[in-house]
Amino acid sequence: MIWRKEYLKKNYIKLLVPICVVLVLAYLNYAINYAVGYKLVYVHHSHAVAIILWVLLGFFQLELLVYWVLIFLVGPGKSPVFPPIDLYSENNKGLIPLPDLFFCDEKGFPYYCSNSNSIKLERSFFSKDVGYNVIKFDHYCIWIGQPIGQDNYLFFMKFMMGFLAFFIIVLIYCARFTRESIQQGEIDHNFIVLFVMSGFWIIMIGCLFGIHLRYVSINMTTLDEITINQRKRYNRWKDARKNPNMPSWMKTKNPPRKETGRKYVNVKHKTGRAIVRYYIDERPFDMGFRRNWINLVFNGNRNHGKDDEFYTLWRLAAAFVVFIIPFIDIPFSFRGKLQVKDDVEQELHEQENLLAKYTVYSSVVNDKFMNMIDEKLKKNSYSAPGYLVETTPQNNQSTIDKDSI
C-alpha cells in the first residue's frame, strides 16, 4: 500500500505534494475567511454576506475532505489474481477456460503481469503505489496522492467539482470586494494571492474536469488518450523522415516512443481461434453516452451486468442529479461494489467458476466493435494464433514487465 514504510522512503516526493496542497489550502482559508470575510466583509459591509461566505466555503471544503478520504478508503479497484488461460483446451481445473474473446498481443498470447503473477484484464495496470493491478486504471493523481481507477473514479470527479466550486466562490467574493478594499486606503495583498490562485486553479481544474467529462461520455481513460497521442506523435515523426523538403528545425531530433496504436483480440472462430487487429481509437468499451453515464453512477463504473431495461432516460437524468449533488452518490457507489461481489459469489458456484470470475471483472465490448470483428472474419482479415505453432503449453502467456508505475 501507499503508506508502507519502504515505499515512502523511495517515493517521499509523492507524499510531499498532497501535504503542500493542504498547507496552501490552509493559507487560502486564512486569506479568504479572515482577511476578506471577517476584516472587510463582516466588519465593514454585511454580517449575512460574510456568514454566507463561511458556510459555502465550509461546505465545499467538507466535500473535499470527504471525497479525498473516500478516494483512499475505497481505493482504485483491485484486480483479482488470475491463473493463466487454458490456451490449448487441456481442461486443466487450475487454468481459466478459454473465453470467446480476450485481448492479447500480436501472437495471440493473453497479457501476463509478472509483478502480480496474474493474467491482466483489459485496461488494468500494475501500480507500485498500491502494489496490485488496478482495474480500469486512469492515472496517478499527484495532487491527491493516490491512483485513480474504476472504484474511486466517481469520487475523483466529485473531488474536482468541490475544488472548482471553492475557487469560484473565492474569485466571486474577491471581485466583488476589491474596490471596497482599495477604498480602505490600500488593497490587501491577500487579494492579489487570491486572484492569482483562484484564477489559475479555475482554469486548471476546469480544463481537467472537462476532459474527464469527455472520458466518461465515451468510456475512455487517460491512459487510452496518452496512447492515442503517442501514436499521433510517432506518425508525425515517420512522415517527417519521409519528407526531405521539411526544414530541419521542424524535425524531431530524438525519435518518440514507438506507438502504432495497433491492438489485438483473440476470438473464437469456427472450430479454432483468430487474432483480429484493431486500433486504440476505435473505443471498444464505449457503450454510448447514456449507458456510460448510468454505469458510472449506478453500476460501479462497470460497462456490463445490467439489462437493457436498466438504461432509461429517467435513470440518465437521475445519474446527472446524483453526479452534481454532493454526498448522495456515496451509497450508490458502495452498492455498486457490493453488486460486483454478489455477482462473483453467485457465479463461483457454477462449474466454470474461474471463467465466470474473469468475466465479471472484465469489460465487455460494444456491438459496433463486435460487428467490426465479424466483418474482418468474413473477409479473412485475421491471423492464426502464434502459440499454436511457436510455443509449448509450458510457455503460453505474454509477460509484461514494463507496465509498472
UniProtKB/Swiss-Prot annotation:
Protein's cellular compartments: Membrane
Keyword Mitochondrion: no
PTM section of the record: Autopalmitoylated.
Residue span(s) of domain DHHC: 111-161
InterPro entries in the cross-refs: Palmitoyltrfase_DHHC, PFA4/ZDH16/20/ERF2-like
Keywords: Acyltransferase, Lipoprotein, Membrane, Palmitate, Transferase, Transmembrane, Transmembrane helix
Top EC class for this record: transferase
GO biological process, any: protein targeting to membrane
EC number: 2.3.1.225
A GO MF label: protein-cysteine S-palmitoyltransferase activity
Reactions that this protein is recorded to catalyse: L-cysteinyl-[protein] + hexadecanoyl-CoA = S-hexadecanoyl-L-cysteinyl-[protein] + CoA
An example Gene Ontology CC term for this record: membrane
Residue ranges of the TM segments: 12-32, 51-71, 154-174, 191-211, 310-330
Major location category of this protein: membrane
The keyword Transmembrane helix belongs to this UniProt entry's keyword annotation: yes
Protein family according to the UniProt entry: Belongs to the DHHC palmitoyltransferase family. PFA5 subfamily.
Protein name per Swiss-Prot or TrEMBL: Palmitoyltransferase PFA5
Gene that encodes the chain: PFA5
